[in-house]
């Protein structure tokens, strides 16, 4: 199920379509995720909407995500944001896009993040690679938006993924995990 950003986006999207988000069941929400969710799971019937549009104005979308996070705004880009990642998990605003034939997850800043969070996350990814951690390609888009090549897809298949919070049954909204908890997963 979408959480954080994904739930907020889905609820706003449903409202602009004239649907009360509190009146749809969990199964109906899963049908709206359909084949567009993260990882290997797909849900039928599939009522998901996605876009194959390659070129997005990331700066405009970042501004729109700020409005959505801080107000009840449901403006021009809401449908674009929904179609490019409305089913995604996690708390931060993000989009899934195809650029030069590669599928990317590009993250935007959440309200409590430092202004340069994209650059920070990108530098962490470079450090992880220097330490020998095998991870997908990363990139800093337009100098400020962290992107990672989709790790839940290969050319021919989908890859199951699960978050540490999911494995440990931890509430992702409340910082409650430390490195000791993560090491227990190993």
Q: Where do the model's predicted regions map?
A:
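Phosphate/dinucleotide-binding and metal-coordinating scaffold of catalytic cores
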Residues: 1-186
């Amino acid at each position: 199920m979408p959480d954080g950003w994904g739930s907020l986006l889905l609820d706003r999207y449903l409202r602009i379509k004239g649907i009360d988000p509190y009146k749809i069941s969990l199964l109906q929400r899963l049908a709206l995720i359909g084949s567009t969710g993260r990882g290997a799971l797909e849900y039928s019937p599939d009522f998901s909407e996605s876009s194959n549009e390659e070129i997005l104005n990331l700066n405009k979308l970042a501004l729109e995500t700020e409005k959505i996070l801080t107000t009840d705004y449901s403006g021009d880009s809401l449908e674009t944001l929904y179609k490019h990642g409305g089913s995604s998990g996690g708390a931060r605003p993000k989009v899934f896009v195809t650029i030069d034939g590669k599928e990317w997850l590009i993250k935007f800043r959440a309200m409590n993040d430092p202004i340069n969070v994209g650059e920070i996350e990108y530098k962490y990814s470079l450090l992880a690679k220097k330490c020998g951690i095998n991870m997908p390609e990363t990139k800093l888009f337009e100098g400020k938006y962290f992107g990672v090549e989709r790790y839940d897809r290969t050319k021919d298949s989908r890859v199951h993924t699960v978050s540490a919070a999911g494995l440990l049954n931890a509430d992702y909204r409340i910082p409650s995990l430390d490195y000791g908890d993560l090491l227990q997963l190993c």
